[in-house]
Regions:
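Glycine-rich cofactor/substrate-binding loops
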Residues: 72-246
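Internal glycine-rich alpha/beta core junctions
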Residues: 1-104
Length: 246
């Protein structure tokens, strides 16, 4: 009755048997915490890379005690990301401890369960701390769309060559379209020009699209219009999130 009441108070299921002889549940929850923290670490890694001076697309929330430098007052260090990454780095070793404790003799073998509880407690604290820090990061993240667009334009349209190739391939055939765009890309790099300008002068492109060539190239080489399945993927993820919370 006490166990049932505790389970209800914590909104947890009541196991059919005691944990004394079933050590897998400790490893199971530890693995879940490690996976959660590892996922947060992946996000923190990407955010920290996006904060680099050369990229500069995002920044952690500014404020007193948030990423300032003792010697360089202009800096906004990714201290939140560092905290999450530190937790994610420690988690695999802690999870390994729980896995190592699985083959215990009899019930609650000496040393095994003592290692489990200390490890599980630490993993819970690390996961909770990483989750709390990431929540603050996302809520206050400073995003620079203009810098993102600048970075997209660094290749002068080359990253969108595939879009042109696919559209041109519908008229010329894929292999010929690939040849045209590949050759135009080389000329753009050699001449220091945009892919759009080089393609607009290409004989195959002009012959295929005629007076509409420049207009079509402008549309195809606009990165905001080349999102693929991204919007649908986001909708699917949000729908799955709502379904699991229901």
């Amino acid at each position: 009755a006490v166990a049932q009441a505790l389970a209800q108070a914590l909104d947890l299921p009541l196991p059919a048997a005691s944990w004394h002889g079933e050590q897998d549940r400790m490893a199971d929850i530890g693995a879940a915490l490690a996976l959660l923290t590892g996922t947060l670490g992946h996000l923190a890694r990407d955010l920290s890379l996006m904060m680099q001076t050369e990229v500069g697309e995002v920044a952690e929330p500014a404020g007193a005690g948030k990423g300032g430098s003792s010697t360089m007052p202009h800096k906004r260090n990714p201290v939140g990301c560092a905290t999450v990454l530190a937790a994610a780095t420690r988690m695999p070793g802690l999870a390994a401890t729980l896995l190592a404790a699985l083959p215990q003799e009899h019930e609650r073998a000496l040393g095994g369960w003592q290692a489990q509880w200390a490890t599980l407690r630490e993993m819970a604290c690390l996961a909770a701390g990483a989750l709390d820090r990431m929540r603050d990061l996302i809520a206050g993240l400073d995003v620079d769309p203009a810098r993102m667009r600048t970075n997209l334009d660094l290749t002068h349209g080359l990253i969108l060559g595939e879009a042109v190739m696919l559209a041109l391939g519908a008229d010329l055939g894929r292999l010929q379209a690939h040849h045209v765009v590949e050759a135009a890309s080389r000329r753009a790099v050699e001449q220091g020009r945009t892919l759009r300008d080089v393609l607009a002068e290409d004989a195959d492109v002009v012959r295929t699209w005629g007076d509409a060539a420049k207009q079509r190239l402008d549309a195809l080489l606009d990165p905001t219009g080349y999102l693929g399945d991204a919007a649908a993927a986001v909708d699917r993820v949000l729908a799955e999130h709502d379904r699991r919370r229901a």
